[in-house]
From Swiss-Prot:
Protein's name according to its UniProt entry: 2-C-methyl-D-erythritol 4-phosphate cytidylyltransferase
NCBIfam families (UniProt xref): ispD
Organism: Shewanella halifaxensis (strain HAW-EB4)
EC number: 2.7.7.60
Claim: Disulfide bond is one of the keywords in the record: no
Top enzyme category: transferase
GO biological-process terms attached to the record: isopentenyl diphosphate biosynthetic process, methylerythritol 4-phosphate pathway
InterPro entries, per database record: IspD, IspD/TarI, IspD/TarI_cytidylyltransf_bact, Nucleotide-diphossugar_trans
Catalytic activity: 2-C-methyl-D-erythritol 4-phosphate + CTP + H(+) = 4-CDP-2-C-methyl-D-erythritol + diphosphate
Keyword terms of this UniProt record: Isoprene biosynthesis, Nucleotidyltransferase, Transferase
Length: 230
């Protein structure tokens, strides 16, 4: 029997400053093919027919978001984000319907496709606890010691690169994020909060070009992917 969420929302934590880019402005506002990285991300989410609402968590000192062309879209809402990603996600979850499901997506992943969103949403029937997009590890993985010397080769079997969106019921994600943070757990993404609570999220294989723009070289790569998008 298929499950149909009461509502599907997207949450975009966009309160960070992206210091590793070495740019003068937060990386989500850097230009990419004639509009900002965040604009590309929002365009994909706002245009998806199954997403009812897109909630963006912003830095309280943000002076850039109001200039985006998407700012007046009827499906868009904004909240004040926090210092950490998890705090921003919680801010978005707090204004969501209790029976909704949340797609949490990185602001700096502008190459997301509707096809991957469709696959993730459909996975609720196989993974009623929630799931994430991920890409299988293809390269040989090495672990180093504290001196930067290779100490071992890590078996890549069943290893995945975690991507976003990550898709969970609003009520359980909010509870587990809250509890994990209160316990001082290291939470790097939504799945890690669910794992901490004993939930085993599913994996949905996603496109490897759904990259996160983190370093300057990533901008050129994202530009190429967007130009060749099908």
């Amino acid at each position: 029997m298929s499950q149909t969420p009461e509502q599907i929302i997207a949450i975009v934590p966009a309160a960070g400053i992206g210091s590793r880019m070495g740019a003068e402005i937060p990386k989500q506002y850097l230009q990419l093919n004639e509009q900002s990285i965040l604009s590309h991300t929002l365009d994909c989410l706002l245009s998806h027919p199954d997403i009812d609402k897109v909630i963006v968590a912003l830095n309280p000192a943000d002076n850039y978001f109001a200039k985006l062309p998407q700012v007046k879209h009827p499906k868009l809402e904004c909240v004040i984000g926090g210092k950490e990603r998890a705090d921003s996600v919680l801010s978005g979850l707090k204004i969501a319907e209790a029976g909704a499901w949340a797609l949490v997506h990185d602001a700096a992943r502008p190459c997301l496709t509707h096809r991957d969103i469709d696959k993730l949403i459909a996975s609720v029937n196989e993974f009623p606890q929630g799931a994430i997009l991920a890409a299988p590890v293809r390269d040989t993985m090495k672990r180093t010691d504290e001196k930067g010397l290779i100490s071992e080769t890590v078996c890549r079997e069943r290893l995945w690169h975690a991507l976003t969106p990550q898709y969970f019921p609003v009520s359980s994600l909010m509870q587990n994020l809250t509890d994990a943070l209160a316990a001082g757990a290291l939470i790097t993404d939504e799945a890690s909060a669910m794992e901490w609570a004993g939930v085993m999220p599913g994996i949905v294989s996603g496109r490897a070009d759904n990259i996160k723009v983190t370093h300057p070289d990533d901008l050129q790569l994202a530009s190429l992917f967007l130009k060749n998008a099908v």
